[in-house]
């Protein structure tokens, strides 16, 4: 992500969770990916007796992280904005840390590993080691990688997807969510004063499907998971209270 975007997220981290649109987008994302998580978890449990290891790239303040955490063994939560990671760390270090999880409020921070890093290498030493007795050795790989509202900030999506591919175990999957580029109106997802660090105004569905296949993903599926009604009143020609529906894509794929 661009440095201008990182600075924006650093500045907004303390108040990020107070944004109703952010909360609603996260809730809808979790509702859409929860069945994917559960299916993978059941499959791994039945074949190995173990629970899922998950990587979330662009975790922000952990709104999605803390919903996913009760469903998995561990979730490594990565974000390049130190303000966001500091906010997540403050949450999980608070004894009363409570988020709305899969079946209601619970303390679910024990298995969250925050990492402040712009992740560009599957062997980045900031990631947990595969072997705890060899901290400088190969990095752990993951059963599932999540990323929510991140891809429209990424300059080189091919390289980004390649990094995610390299972070998966064989048979591991990605479930990536972001708003769709449905035409000229998609620019209104962000207010005019928050376009710094925005690389594209949504993700074109067919283009994304083709790109994932080119990177090497199999069993690729890119589909609309939900629509978010978002305020667009700050744009020229709009009236106070005006909203627009933004379709969100769920982008799935597996590493062979």
Task: Walk through the language-model features, giving the residues of each.
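Class I SAM-dependent methyltransferase SAM/SAH-binding core
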Residues: 52-130
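C-terminal lobe and adjacent flexible extensions of AdoMet/dcAdoMet transferase-like proteins
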Residues: 250-256
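Conserved class I S-adenosyl-L-methionine
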Residues: 1-52, 87, 94, 118-123, ...
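C-terminal alpha-helical "lid/dimerization" subdomain adjacent to the S-adenosyl-L-methionine
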Residues: 9, 20-22, 64-66, 175-245, ...
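A conserved beta-strand element that flanks and buttresses the S-adenosyl-L-methionine
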Residues: 146
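Short catalytic micro-motifs in class I SAM-dependent methyltransferases
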Residues: 149-153
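Local beta-strand N-terminus motif with an aromatic residue
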Residues: 51, 141-142
